[in-house]
Curated annotation (Swiss-Prot):
Residues 227-522 are lumenal. Induction: Induced in roots during drought and salt stresses, and upon abscisic acid (ABA) treatment. It comes from Arabidopsis thaliana. PANTHER family: O-ACYLTRANSFERASE (WSD1-LIKE) FAMILY PROTEIN, WAX ESTER SYNTHASE_DIACYLGLYCEROL ACYLTRANSFERASE 4-RELATED. This is Wax ester synthase/diacylglycerol acyltransferase 4.
Amino acid sequence: MEIETRPHISGDEKEEEQPLSPAARLFHAPEFNCNIISVIGFKSKLDPCVFIRGFKESFIRHPRFSSKLVTDENGQNQRWVRTNVVVEDHFIVPKIKPQNIENSNAFLEDYVSDLMKIPLDTSRPLWELHLLDLKTSDAENVAVLKIHHSVGDGMSIMSLVLACMRKTSNPDELPSLPYQYRSSSRSSLLTTGSRSDSRLLWLVKVIWTAVILGLNTVCDALEFIVTTLFVKDTETPIKGDFLSTKSKQLRLVHRTVSLDDIKLTKNAMNMTINDVVLGVTQAGLSRYLARRYGEEETKNRKQKKLPKRIRLRSALLVNLRPTTGIQDLADMMEKGSKCRWGNWFGYVVFPFSIALRDDPLEHLEIAQKTISRKKNSYGAMLTYIFCRIIVKLLGIKVAASIINRMVSNTTMTFSNMVGPVEEVSFYGHPITYFASSAYGHPHALTIHCQSYMNKMTITLIVDPTVISDPHRLCDDWEESLRSIKAAVTKRESLRLWDYLRILHNRVAWLLYQIAGLLYRML
């Protein structure tokens, strides 16, 4: 059965064809060919007919999911062309053998790994959904959604998926999504200064903030340039050989931890959740690398401890939309809205300080200090503008080569996304977790964190020839979170004890004064 999608075209998109944006063209370059993959766990059995009917009524109404990629004979001009969509062709329901059900977690990892090796069919819209009747340790059934990155970034894709979901507690209500405008430290400073300080002091603050912003932006721009030209990360056990990465098989693993533990740390340390996640990631990487270097020491019978000066940097993805959180599809597609569908993100080079520390809270403090400086900069916006200019002036091949070189000189990719705060259902099927990430870029390690309800899911995509034990890396991440939580709890206990001691001393002093007064009166 075919569905004609043209009647769903909005007034702003009556054109049958639309050219690819510079970012979308980059994602189709041979150096990248990036895809987004999301493993979704469900509480109940999946009904393929219900999903197909739901996709017909909602999902394919979006132009990008009812358009195919068309390339000219010379391969230079690429465009989206609206087409008829046979929804059933995009659904895959594999037959799973009984022996695979016994070790379902390993089978799911192998299935997703094989799926990441197969390119999407460009003769139809670039997405597909796999429905697996497979019970795993944390889900009754599993779905795997695969979408080409040229269709949109993670924020766009998630907004569309969530627009198709409903609250489990109220099937008629859309998920409650965080919707907060960015409030940088510099903007709050200027607002506060304009209200309470004199004009001269406020002017000094404005000038000082502008100077710091400019210096940080220049530093980030120079870091981008030198990284592209010659500055490479240390050859650690998690940095891959990117010349042959495309021929290697990737693996996706995930681990779910308590979001309440992260919030407890956030509140105690006066940080954001993103600060805590970066700090825990830094601690987990340090712990994992220390083990890997120790194993090599045992194997080679040579002293090879964790080096003191390791340059390990991440390409940290930054959402450039003027609002934070995941915007619902209606807001994102509304005419005049500041939120737009597509690939609207830049990235900054984020250095992780790799070391084993006696106080695990130092990892949080270092990460917060670094990311605070990165936030007070237009470095991410500059990378976005730079990519667009290079694509237009020098062509997609030169631009892809430059970006590929810059990314290859770093070690990993990191991203973080906020999810629904309550349980949601996908066409009537309650969801237990989202494990999403992207692949195709030249990194042996990609870490993506996504919150959902009171949980945080950490998803790793690794090159198994470089990181053969990704579950141990997940263990180190989780153990680092536990040690940081324990340190925070201990600090809070000591702080409470100090408060009680001060209170005790003051009460004792007060009683002494009262006793002295009574003695004199008598």
